[in-house]
Amino acid sequence: MVWGTGYGNPSPLNPYGFASLHRGGLNPLILAPENITFDTLNTHNDHEETHGESPEVPKASIAPAGRQNVPVLQQNQENEDNHALGGSEDAKDEREIRFSAIKTLYNYYSEGPSTPIMPHLVNRLRGLDALAKIDATLTKVDMNAAYIFALRPTFPYSYGYKQRFSNRRLTTSALCYARTGLSSFLTVDKTYTSNSPLKGGSRGWPIFNVDVSSHVAEPHMRTLSPIGLEVFNLATSQFSKTLLTASSKVFTQSLYTADILSIFGEVFLPHVMQPVSNYTPILVRALLALIHILGPGSGNCSLSSSIFESSIPQFLTVSHSTNMSNRTRYCLHTRSAYKDMFRNGIPPQSTLPPTLAPEGSSARVLIPEALVTSPMFPWLLILVSSGPQFFLYSKDASINTVDIGSRGRITSPIPDVAKLDLHRLWNLFRFDGYRYIDVVIVGADRDYVWPYQNGVYVHGGKGPNGTGNYGNADVHDGIGTIFSSFNNNVNVQTSDLMLGLLTLWNHITTTYATEEEVTMAIKIAAAFALVYPVQPIVYSGCPKAFQRHTSYYQPSSENCYATDTAEVKSVWDTVELSVQVNNAMVLGMTLPFGQPTLSSAQWYNNIDKAEISMFKVGNLPLQNLDYLSLDMMEFYAPTTGQLYDIRSDNLILSAHRTVNLGIGYTALADFFAYLASVPAQSFYHDRMVTSPISKQTYSVYERFIERFIDDFVGWDRCDLFNLDTLLGAKHIAGVASSPIPWHCSLQRCPLPIIMHYTGLTFGQEHITVRDVAGVEGLQQIVMRDFQGRIVVERLGTAAPSRIAVKLDWSRLSAWYSDTTCAIPLSDRVMEIVNYAAIWDPTQERHAQVSCTHTLAPISFRALTCLSLYSIRVSTLHHLMTTRAKL
C-alpha cells in the first residue's frame, strides 16, 4: 500500500511530489514532519512532474496496548506518548512509531462541534493506513513503495474537473494489468512499438506476449525508478506462482484509452503495485470485476475473441448520446486459452457495452427488462466514470431509464425517489450538500451470474465439477479464486460485479482515500449490507472442504496447500470463507489467513508487524479478517485439528470442528463505529489493544452511533436491542414489516449499536442486580465502571444467582417464524454474561464455551458473545481490531 495520488510539487504534506485528485489539492495522508500544516490542502497546481530520490520517511511511534488513559490528542505530545508506552523497553522500541501527522489530522478533523462525522472516519482510515505502512520493521523497498506512483495517471474525468492530461496515461503494461488482473507490471523500463510483443526483462519477470495497439502512443510510456523496480521484482516473485502463466496462455489486448479506469484505477492501481502478497486474491477479484463492469468497447474494437461476448450477462446496456469518434475507444481481446476457461458450460450472454460517459456528454442507461421485473433485483446499478457518488433507489415504479448528465448528475427525475424504502439510508449518504446519482446497485441472481451457471464452477486446472483440464493451472489461482464454488453440495452463485464493488470499498478505506472516495465506499458497502441478508457458509478441515473448490493455493495431497518450506507449512493455515446471499450470490469469498507464496520467514515477520488486522491464535496468525463479526468464538485449524480460543491463545476443549465466523452487516457498521470510537493510539495493534477510549473520542462514537441509528436503521430494525426493551418490563412485539425483510437478519445489526443500546459499553467492571420491592420478577440492574461509577441503571429481569442478565426470546422467535427470514431463531433463553462471571480465566473459558454450545442461532451468537466480551476492554478491542483492515 502506498500513499499519495499522483504527480505534484513537493511540500511538507507531499514530500514525494504527488498530487491528489481530491479537489485538485494534496492528500493529507502524506506523512509529514512535526510542523505539518494544512495550508496546501486546497492548493491547485499544474501537476508538474518531479523526479529524484524519495526523502526518508520518518520513523513513527504510537502508544500501543497498555495505556490506561488516552488524553485528547495534541501536536506536541510526543514525550507524554513515549512516557506512557508501558511495557518493557524492548516493547517500547518495537512499537515506537511517531505519528505527528496523524495527531495533526486528528486535531484538524476534530475541531468544532459542527465537524461532520465523515471526516472523523476518513481520518481514522488514513491513520490506519499510515500507521501500518510506516512501521519501522518494513524494508526500505516497502517504505519507498510510494515512489512507484511514477506509473500512476491522473484521470481527467474522475471528479468532474479537468487536469492536464499530457503524460498522464498509463503505461501499456500497467493498463494491461489493470484490465486483466493477471500480471505484474511487465518490462516497464522499455519503450514499446505498436503490436510488438513485450518480452520479459532481466529482473526475472515471466515472459509475456501482449499485443500493444498502435493507439497507445509511445510518449505515454513511463519507466520505473530503481526502487520501483525492486518493488515490482518482489511483487512479481510473489505473483508468479499463483497469478502468472506462460506467454502462450496469456492475453492479446488492444487498449485504446487511459481514462477507462476512472475512479477504479485511482483505487486499485496503488494496490496492484504494492508488494504485500496478501492483497493478491482480493485484487484479482476486484480487477476482474472491473473488467466485467467496464466491458468491451465499440466502434473499431473487434469482439470476436472477447470473453465478454460469451460469458458476461447483460447487466446494463448503455448508449452514448455523443459521437465518440474523436475520443479514444477501448476494448479487450483475449487469447482463447483464457476465454475457454469461462466458456465451458456457460450459455451465451449479451455483450456488455461500455458504461462510460465522457465529459460533456450524457448517457442513457437502459436497464434490461429482466432486471426490472425480477424480484431478485430490488436495486439497479448505473456506473459512470464521472465521479465516485452513486445513488440507490427502488424500482417500485418500474423505472427503466435514467439520464445521466456530464458529471453523472441525474438530468431527469426518477419518479419513485420519494418512495425510497431506504430514504434514511440516502440521508446518510449526503456529503458536501450533493445529492445526485452516479451509481445504482444492481442485484444479481443465478440467471445473471458470471461465470457460473447451475452451480458449475471453473477451475484453472480443472474442468466443470472438478473434472477435466483446461491447461491453465497457473492462471486459475488468479482467476479461479474469484469464482469459488466450494463443492457440489452447495450451489454457490457468484457475481464478480458485486464482489468487485464490495472489494472496492474495502480498498478505498484502507488507502489514501479522499472524502469522496470514502463516501463512495460507504455507500457501496451500505447498499450491500442492506440489500442482501447473509448467511455464512464456512468450510474448514483439509480433506473434505478443500477438495473440490477453487483455492487460492495449489492443492496438495499432504496438507492442501503447496508451500515451499517446512517453516511455512508449520506456521500458516488457511480458511476459505464464503457468504451465501439469497441462495444466489457470494459477496465475501476466499479470505486468506496466510500467504505461503513468498516462502520466507522474513516476509512472515514483516506482515506480522505491519498488518493491523493480524492477531495470533495459538500458533496461527490470522489476517484479513475483513468481513468478520465479533462473534468469532473459536477458530479451527485444519492442519492441527484443534480449536483455539482467540482471546487467550489457549485451546478450547470442545468437539466442535467448525469455524464460527459471522459475516454480514457488521462489515460496514461495526467497523466505522469502531473507527469513530477508538483513538489513533489504539490503531497499532500487535496482540491486544487495551487503551481505553478517551472522553472526546467516545463522544465521537456516540454521535456516530446516534446518527447511524437515526439515518440507517431508524425504522426499528435495531430497536430490538434497545436496553429499555431488553431489560425493561415490556413485551417484545417485534419490528414493523417492510417490503423486503432486511430486518430479518439480526446478525446484520451493528454490534456497536447493540452495545450502545444494551448499555454494555466499554470497561464495565461488574453488574449489580437487585429486586424491586412490590414488583414481582422485576429487578434493578446497575452496571458500574472501573471507578465504581454507575454506567447503566435500568429495570429488568435477571438471575441474581448467576449474576447474569437473562433474556427470553420466545416471543421474538414466534414472530420470526411467521416471516420469510432465512435464519430460524431459537426460543432458548439467552444469557448476557457479565464481567464478574468471566473475569476468572477458567470461568471465562467456560462461559465462552457455554455460549458457543447453547446458542444455536448464529444471529444471536453475535449479540451474546459480543456482550460476553464487550465488558473487557482488552478483549473488545482485540476483537474489534480484526476488522481494522477494512
Curated annotation (Swiss-Prot):
The keyword Hydrolase does not apply. GO terms for biological process: viral translational frameshifting. It is found in: Virion. Its main location: virion. Residues 42-61 are annotated as: Disordered. Acetylation is necessary for viral assembly. Residues 44-56 have a biased composition (Basic and acidic residues). The keyword Kinase does not apply. GO terms for cellular component: T=2 icosahedral viral capsid. Keywords: Acetylation, Capsid protein, T=2 icosahedral capsid protein, Virion. The modification N-acetylmethionine is found at M1. Belongs to the totivirus major capsid protein family. Capsid protein self-assembles to form an icosahedral capsid with a T=2 symmetry, 35 nm in diameter, and consisting of 60 capsid proteins asymmetric dimers. The capsid encapsulates the genomic dsRNA and the polymerase and remains intact following cell entry to protect the dsRNA from degradation and to prevent unfavorable antiviral responses in the host cell during all the replication cycle of the virus. Nascent transcripts are transcribed within the structural confines of the virion and are extruded into the cytoplasm. Binds and removes 5' cap structures from cellular mRNA. This is Major capsid protein.
